[in-house]
Amino acid sequence: GPHGEIPSNVDPVARRVSYGGTAGRIDANLWFLIGCGEYWRATGDEGFLNRLVPVIEKVRFLLGAWEFNNRGLLYVPLTGDWADEYLHNGYVLYDQLLYLQAQQTLARVHESVHGSADHALVDRISRLRHLIRSNYWFAADEDGSLPDDLYHEVLYRKGLKAATHCRDRHWMASFSPAGYSYRFDALANVLASLLDDAHEAQRQR
């Protein structure tokens, strides 16, 4: 798309391009970055990477805009990812985990193309990992202490109070200005382990 949007579906026969449902898809952009990075790592095709760098940069810029308030997490509208039949929106864990992986891909691409690390991006990756760990897992802390890097302390406190049935058992699916979603998102929980965001005790849950 003109701003870096990646289509979620392409019909080469009918020449139709779809960018998603009513609100478009956030995760198509994330999977595009991850896929490009994995293909490049597997093949060593530098020509492919060099051709795609301008597109990758547009996608990166668009994702930054989708943070809305520049605080590190992507805001996902209703129908904004693959799970468009589920009523979830806001700061969806699945999309944040993909965003973390996509940013790690961007860091590797930058180092290959420019021969040096993008230190600002490295800092963003570290912050995103902390945000995920702090805001999506309700630990059963008896002393009442709160994690660092809370996105919104009032939302977190209310969510923690209502999460007695799932506290310290699984990652929360999402949160938004309306509060937390306590639904068990199997894919997001698996990704949290596969992408090394979960520590060993959380994996064992």
Task: Show where each model-derived region lies.
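Aromatic-rich carbohydrate-recognition surfaces in CAZymes
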Residues: 1-70, 93-100, 203
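Residues at structural and domain junctions
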Residues: 18-19, 49, 85, 118, ...
